[in-house]
Amino acid sequence: MHESNPQSMHEAPTPNAFLIQDEVRQAFGWSEVDDIESAVDLQLLLEHHPHWSPLQREHTLQRVEKQLLGAQRVIILGAAIEENELVSYNRPGDIFVAADGAVGALPGYSQLACIVSDLDGGEFLNAAAKQGQTVVVHAHGDNKQRWAESLSSWQQCPQPPSLILSHQVNQTILGMHNFGGFTDGDRALCFVLSLGVHPKNVELVGFSLNQVGQWSGITIAETKLKKLKWMERIVSELGFGHFIKK
């Protein structure tokens, strides 16, 4: 179900957006073995799922890709978004990609392409998922219980969300993707760029270096601020550092 393949083991917009994942693991003392286990378990769970099979997920990815490439502007919402900041982001051609709980800042879902999440976004993520919104579910070593509980709940909804699966390991896992990045926010940027959206058509709002955003969901403030340093590096290396509040 998974194999080493340096030529196809990631789809990150730049090699470093992928390679930095090893640096993050080393910095926090995390094991790639745990990340692999979580990703493979998620893949196996959904292999023959009636709503989220590999073929259905591929169709979802193609639909989101088409939506993003057709947008005049793709706005990525970070957890520090203030609702009044959205006033200037309501043009007909605007499409949103929300980082986890930041989806709660949106007044509705009509312009939402997807939510990129490792599933700690709490009530706002759950509300969107239970209304059939698309979620790019990320597996890592510390969220097995979260994704298991979330998917168990969502599959019982009258209109379950559509899913795309991502991981952060140095291996190919069939039916999953490594788009690069680390936090939900910078991974959302990596996701959008990896699908071929031109950088000039992408804007970030609600990205902060020194503030744990109100939409962050379940988090430990001290750890989150450390993670934001990595977010800043990834976003800056991709050429979007000027969007980060400092």
Short names for language-model regions:
Residues I164-L165, N201-G206, F243-K246:
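A structural signal for short, well-ordered beta-strand segments and their strand-loop junctions
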